[in-house]
């Protein structure tokens, strides 16, 4: 009987410690997010014929830009909430002649990609673009007699004679 009470006391002391292994919140595990967050709304804004800069503005910088596949951008988003099984979403964007041609991935196809006619003009009619002035045509003109080039040509021989 004397040995029974100390054993019972030890059992009662260590019993609460065994319950710590059954608590799911201990230890705390953080949510891990990797890659680009791409939503259905962002994918719905994509239209065939968009430029690379327009796609980058809409979706953000791609996670993978492969040098061997220059006309393909990959957007990958992976999340592991609280140590649970990771979820992964992928979106691959394809370009042809630097214009968006089609997309693949875990997102529904936007309505614009089901149409047969690709969108051509993304700028409003008010926007006009004027080319930069041609500065190369001025390079071929001969400077006048009082110009710097003629002055240097005339004084070049005198300069070298004086410095020898």
UniProtKB/Swiss-Prot annotation:
Compartments (UniProt record): Cell outer membrane
InterPro entries named in the record: BamE (IPR026592), BamE-like (IPR037873), BamE_dom (IPR007450)
Chief place where the protein resides: membrane
Gene Ontology cellular-component annotations: Bam protein complex
Biological processes per GO annotation: Gram-negative-bacterium-type cell outer membrane assembly; protein insertion into membrane
Pfam families assigned: BamE
Entry keyword set: Cell outer membrane, Membrane, Signal
Stretch list, region Disordered: 111-164
Oligomeric and partner information: Part of the Bam complex.
Protein known as: Outer membrane protein assembly factor BamE
Entry function: Part of the outer membrane protein assembly complex, which is involved in assembly and insertion of beta-barrel proteins into the outer membrane.
Gene name tied to this protein: bamE
Signal peptide, first to last residue: 1-19
Organism of origin: Nitrosomonas europaea (strain ATCC 19718 / CIP 103999 / KCTC 2705 / NBRC 14298)
Domain of life: Bacteria
Keyword Signal: yes
Family: Belongs to the BamE family.
GO molecular function annotations of the record: protein-macromolecule adaptor activity
Compositional bias annotation for Polar residues: 117-140, 153-164
